[in-house]
From Swiss-Prot:
Residue ranges with Acidic residues bias: 716-746
Pfam family, one: VIT
Ranges of compositional bias, category Low complexity: 650-690, 777-814
Location of the region described as Disordered in the Swiss-Prot/TrEMBL record: 625-814
Protein name: von Willebrand factor A domain-containing protein DDB_G0292016
Biased amino acid composition, Basic and acidic residues: 752-774
Superkingdom of origin organism: Eukaryota
Residues of the VWFA domain: 299-467
Length: 918
């Protein structure tokens, strides 16, 4: 049963105790905050803060948080009261670290007995209005969200000695963790480090019963509402807290297990602006799926560090691990393998469907892996992978194995994080000198897992641990069908639903406009007491399509006293629109501004703005206090490097240092450098230009730096890694001749080289030019194979058709490696079977087949059972390495036996018999 693999996942993620929340995916945002700055600096950056002779001008006196939580989200009202000791007018900054799943949906400023409400404006207009108000001596407040995850509120011309009250409304998704837990996190970086009065109250209103409520870091009382079937509860502080907040506050909610999607519905009325919104959350259980029943589609991409530092035992172990990995995949998968260093190469131009031909080519590629690619440049292959559209039918899972460190690590992590909804990343850090933050950061950014391999002795076992996690049951290619109930013009967010991996929770929002068609359907549903049914479908763990009905009960489940679901639905839709601008270069500004104004949301194109005419126009010089500049900033390319290995989940403090990569600038080196290295060098050399200080609010240096990096990546993506010049065209004839000669030399080999790739190999670039393209190095060619026919296309690195047939049973002779387990796996077919002709060379007896399998056409079934028995019996201590390959074989044998209409226990009986014979 999958409970055993679930326990592996719990071990990797640190278990499911209340103190392991730091391993949850949602906590990665806070983990990065902790790495980038000290606690002292971070706590000075939160709230309203200024420096005047190193003394606080604003001091937080009172802080209350009132929160309402439902099945999937929370709405919190933060009220903070500050005293103001300034003797002059002041321009201050209010800052709050804001999680990517959170959004400020309202804010108010109260001072001089006035309550001033923030309004959403288009960002440029808000900035213009703010500057005009300041210039005329009036008060103004403007709020934006920065790229580094902070909600920034600029308060201009605050009168001296006037106390200030800030009220902020924050809507957020709940954090999710293993075992279906829901977390509401208040990180300590959200609070100043000094003492203040703190009041904390939470109301829970769930649609399903709550199993347990716990709170880490704060003493609370929990009271369930009477007659609510434990669906509603109130959480309050046990006592008055006057010492502030010293630790993270994590509210841990454990709902009862519900293996079906659950919906919540919200209605906003008034005038013509009526609408419905829904929130659907789903935490499926796959506990009843046996490992050998899992036959789900997925794309596996492996990146192997082949830099010089990997030479010796590390690269040998990596090669052996890859030998095992490629035999662990099955015919529901796509696969590709990259080797990277100063340049990179890959076995296929695009990931190929896994079959005998693919396996043979990949196997030949793996045999030639060596530590011969110079330095460690991970960005170019990652751009090559992530710039390709993902296939929803084949969830993309990337495995990175490295022993080094890279330049501009943080920028790479930020880049891959943008693909968290399309790609899951697993990372392995080898040895004591690996950049631990790179390994952890890449995996956490894309909701994967990591493994620190301190010693290479058991490297294969540790590598396979994460591959097992990637094989766990999941639901992919998820779609919501609204047409079955007749509703139209429904806006779903996110529009593309991320695969639902084991122990993950899905949350989907929608906005249903109250047009005549929809209103008629909903009214009829209410009048007849017949809920509407929509359908969620997805590809299940066994390779079949699963369908889940979702009930929308507009009569009994309708909420009309909040806009919490609307707010998050609009926020998620804005994120979709912003992503479309980034990837597809669409102009969605008008739609984003419209949604921002309607629901009060700060976005890429909107800001909060408040201006107020002062009773007494400020004539004194305004003092600007910018808490952003009270400490040396962390450089965008700064390094926080972790030394030493350790098991996954280690959370010890990591040493910080600023590191830079030394690069040769000699002409000879530049000439020899590959184009992928040129791309990386151009990328890494980017730095934000210094800006003149202005009173007006302006975009940060980080914005400029990110834009340059994005432009650099776009240069590669738009040209597909191939930027030709007139000089290149002059050499086309030579390249054609080279390609023809290569075709003749290879004959019917299993692997050609794309003509474009050959052209690239022929071209000689002027080393003085800046080249932004990424070109894979020439791929090592495997030996000829008579079992694979000559391809009919110009590129043998392009994907094979899905229907590509497996190679014939006759297999070539395989030279022994001296490692019997590897020898056996290397002659396994892609479907998991072995043939008599392949194992005869290993002198494994296959006679004494049971009567049911004694005919020649059934030989392969018995042969496969014999090999399974031999591996299980003689390599029991290496089970972690061969487990997936044997599961594939077991599945194939059981399928063949079922076709023969043999009893279900036949496999176990035959396997027991085979063990006695080997």
């Amino acid at each position: 049963m999958f409970s055993s693999i679930t326990s592996k996942l719990s071990a990797i993620s640190g278990g499911s105790s209340k103190n392991d929340y730091k391993e949850a995916n949602y906590y990665n945002y806070f983990r990065i905050l902790e790495k980038k700055q000290t606690e002292e600096i971070a706590r000075k950056r939160c709230g309203l803060y200024s420096l005047k002779n190193h003394n606080n001008v604003f001091v937080l006196k009172e802080f209350s948080i009132e929160t309402e939580i439902n099945d999937c989200s929370s709405t919190s009202i933060w009220t903070q009261s500050y005293s103001n000791d300034s003797n002059t007018p002041v321009e201050a900054k209010y800052q709050l670290p804001l999680h990517p799943t959170s959004v400020v949906s309202n804010f108010q400023i109260e001072y001089q007995g006035k309550v001033i409400q923030g309004k959403i404006k288009e960002k440029e207009k808000a900035l213009e209005k703010y500057n005009d108000a300041i210039a005329s001596g009036g008060q103004a407040f403007m709020a934006t969200k920065s790229d580094d995850g902070y909600f920034n509120l600029t308060l201009g011309n605050l009168p001296p000695k006037e106390n200030v009250k800030v009220r902020v409304v924050i809507s957020s998704e709940l954090g999710t963790h293993t075992d279906g837990q829901l977390h509401y996190c208040l990180h300590r970086y959200m609070f100043p480090s000094y003492a203040f009065n703190f009041n904390y109250n939470v109301v829970l209103k769930f649609s399903i019963p709550i199993k347990s409520i716990d709170c880490d870091g704060f003493d609370v009382n929990v009271n369930y509402k009477e007659n609510s079937s434990k669906k509603e509860a109130k959480i309050t502080s046990k006592s008055q807290h006057t010492s502030g907040v010293k630790k993270n506050i994590i509210l841990i909610i454990q709902p009862v297990e519900l293996n079906e999607p659950k919906s919540m519905i919200e209605y906003i009325g008034g005038g013509d602006d009526k609408s419905y919104a829904t929130a659907i959350n789903f935490y499926p259980s796959f506990k009843n799926v046996n490992p050998d029943e899992v036959y789900q589609k997925s794309e596996f991409i492996f990146l192997i560090d082949c830099s010089g530092s990997m030479s010796g035992q590390s690269i040998n172990k990596a090669r052996r691990a890859m030998e095992i990995i490629i035999r662990s995949l099955n015919e529901q998968h796509k696969v590709n393998i990259y080797c990277f260093g100063s340049s990179f190469n890959k076995v296929f131009d695009k990931s190929r469907v896994y079959n005998d031909e693919t396996l043979e080519i990949a196997g030949s590629f793996v045999e030639k892996i060596s530590a011969n690619l110079g330095g460690t440049e991970l960005l170019p292959p990652m751009v090559d992978i992530l710039s390709s559209p993902n296939d929803p039918e084949y969830p993309r899972q990337v495995f990175i194995l490295t022993d080094g460190e890279i330049s501009e690590r943080d920028k790479l992590i930020d880049y891959v994080a943008k693909e968290a909804n399309t790609t899951r990343i697993f990372t392995y850090g080898i040895g004591a000198s690996v950049d631990q933050e790179l390994v952890i950061g890449l995996s956490k950014a894309c909701k994967g897992y990591y493994e620190m391999i301190k010693e290479t002795t058991n490297m294969e076992k540790q590598v396979m641990k994460l591959l097992n996690v990637a094989f766990e049951p999941m639901l992919s290619n998820i779609k919501l069908d609204w047409s079955s109930c007749g509703l139209v013009d429904v806006i779903q967010a996110p529009s593309h639903i991320r695969p639902l991996f084991n122990q993950e929770r899905m949350m989907i929002y929608s906005m249903i406009p109250s047009n005549q068609t929809n209103q008629d359907i909903i009214n009829a549903s209410i009048e007849t007491s017949k809920p509407l049914i929509i359908t969620l479908t997805g590809d299940g763990p066994k390779g079949n399509v699963l369908s889940f009905p979702i009930t929308l009960d507009f009569k009994n489940d309708l909420s009309t006293n909040s806009n919490q679901i609307h707010t998050l639905a609009a926020f998620k839709h804005i994120q979709d629109l912003e992503e479309s601008e980034r990837k597809e270069k669409k102009d969605n500004k008008d739609k984003i501004v419209e949604l921002g104004k309607k629901y009060g949301l700060v976005s890429k194109h909107t800001s909060y703005i408040v201006t107020a005419d002062s009773d007494n126009v400020t004539e004194e010089t305004m003092k600007t206090v910018d808490i952003m500049n009270q400490s040396p900033p962390i450089r965008p390319g700064g390094r926080i490097v972790s030394r030493g290995g350790g098991r996954s989940g280690a959370s010890g403090a990591l040493s910080s240092s600023i590191l830079s990569r030394k690069r040769s600038s000699s002409p000879s080196t530049a000439t020899k450098r590959s184009s992928s290295s040129s791309f990386s060098s151009s990328y890494l050399s980017l730095s934000s230009s210094s800006q003149k200080k202005k009173k007006e609010v302006s975009r940060s240096d980080d914005d400029d730096d990110d834009e340059k990096i994005e432009n650099c990546v776009e240069s590669y993506e738009s040209d597909g890694g191939d930027q030709s010049s007139e000089q290149d065209e002059e050499e086309e004839d030579d390249c054609d001749d080279f390609h023809e000669d290569l075709d003749e030399d290879l004959g019917a080999t299993a692997m050609d080289v794309d003509k474009k790739e050959c052209e690239k190999e022929c071209k000689k670039k002027d080393s003085s030019k800046v080249d932004l393209k990424v070109k894979p190095s020439k791929v090592p060619l495997p030996s000829r194979s008579p079992s694979v026919s000559k391809p009919t296309t110009t590129s043998l690195l392009s994907p094979s058709p899905k229907s590509a047939p497996s190679a014939p049973s006759q297999q070539k002779s395989v030279k022994s490696t001296g490692d019997l387990l590897i020898d056996l796996l290397k002659i396994q077919k892609s479907n998991g079977s072995w043939t008599k002709s392949s194992i005869d060379q290993l002198k494994i007896p296959t006679d004494k087949a049971p009567a049911e399998l004694s005919t020649t056409e059934l030989n392969d079934i018995w042969v496969t059972i014999i090999v399974i028995a031999k591996i299980v019996k003689f390599f029991s201590s290496e089970k972690a390495q061969y487990e997936l390959a044997i599961q594939k074989s077991t599945r194939w044998v059981k399928l063949q036996l079922s076709k023969l209409n043999l009893p279900e226990n036949t496999f176990d009986k035959f396997l027991s018999n085979a063990k006695s014979l080997v």
